[in-house]
Amino acid sequence: MVESLGISVFRIRLMSFVLAALLAGLSGWLYAHMSRYVSPAPFDLRMGIQYLFMAILGGSGHILGAVVGAALLTLLQNGLQDLLPHFAENGQQLEVIVFAIIYVLALQFARGGVMPFVLRYLPKPVRQAPAAAEPLPRRSMPQAGMPLLTVQDLLKRFGGLEAVSRVGFEVKAGEIVGLIGPNGAGKSTVFNLITGALKSDQGTIVFRGQDITRAGQRRIAKAGIARTFQHVKLRPSMTLIDNVLLGTYVRTRSGFLASALRLDRAEEARARAEALAQIKRVGLGEQAFDQAGNLPLGRQRILEVARALAADPALIILDEPAAGLSRPEKLGLADLLRGLRKEGVTVLLVEHDVEFVMGLVDRIVVMDFGSKLVEGLPAAVRADPRVQEAYLGSVV
């Protein structure tokens, strides 16, 4: 998912590994100076597992988790070493058994560690809305009516199955275009091909005059295409504002070192203000500091739209955005998309609610069995016998 936001997973993993290695090396240097003797014993597999369990026990998702876990495990270990010899001569062997039981219980009933339990009884921090800040840079929008996205002869095979068979269509700037069809027609596969999540076997995809057929997800995101997903992809333990903040990544410039040294506070304030503005824009402003996992599925989809808008895209691709929404929420989503069209943002969406699509889009592309069946205005598509047969079946 993060690749579609313009984030390099490889680079983040590499920097995390280098930082962890740096801290480990520094720890070893301090250990050698403290002990004045270096032995491999404290670094064997058993101790490695114990260090890992310290983080798990405290809570790896919290900054203080490792410290709390180390303190608890050390206290527990010292207590068992004093207590177990009173019950058996082989106290050290019993210690291993007791720790094994604790490991299993912790992984079964407290996967988030003890920190979530501790935080329940501590005063919750006061969440304040970000102060007004200078807006993040905006991208230039293409002139309305100009070709924005051109898909030509797109082909994708999975083994012997042609999921997408020579599909082609064009999306012009300032349009709302619907891509509809029965289940399994290949709509989401087309979206994945356009956004770089899948590579096509044949055909071309041109966006704003640039060939992006073989481009990766990061390059496509930076070019100005943002998307939502058929199956919601959020960080449920993070707040709404932090989830949407991920969408602003392609509009920020601070690097890893500047972030680590907290030299990017001004840019972060601008990004947080942008994230809050997008959350309010989609009608979730009152829940900005709630955890995303606490939202109903329909509102999680709306939150994905806010995250996509935070990237300031020229083209936003929505995969079933109205699924799980109530009728008033669907009407609100339709108004939001019409507002985006007025602002110059182009929308391409897949949706199974045909009535929702018919009342919203400018043009419709219908797919069936991986091929484009028909393309045209909503009224003409609705009346087309081929579309009716694809949805309802033929009369024998």
Where are the model-predicted features located?
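Transmembrane alpha-helical segments in multi-pass inner-membrane proteins
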Residues: R13-V104
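The feature captures the beta-strand-to-loop junction immediately N-terminal to the Walker
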Residues: V177-P182
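Helix-to-loop junction immediately C-terminal to a conserved catalytic motif
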Residues: T195
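Conserved ABC transporter NBD signature motif
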Residues: G203-Q210, K222-A223
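Conserved ABC nucleotide-binding domain
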Residues: T213-R214, Q278-L297
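Catalytic Walker B motif of ABC-type/P-loop ATPase nucleotide-binding domains
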Residues: I316-E320
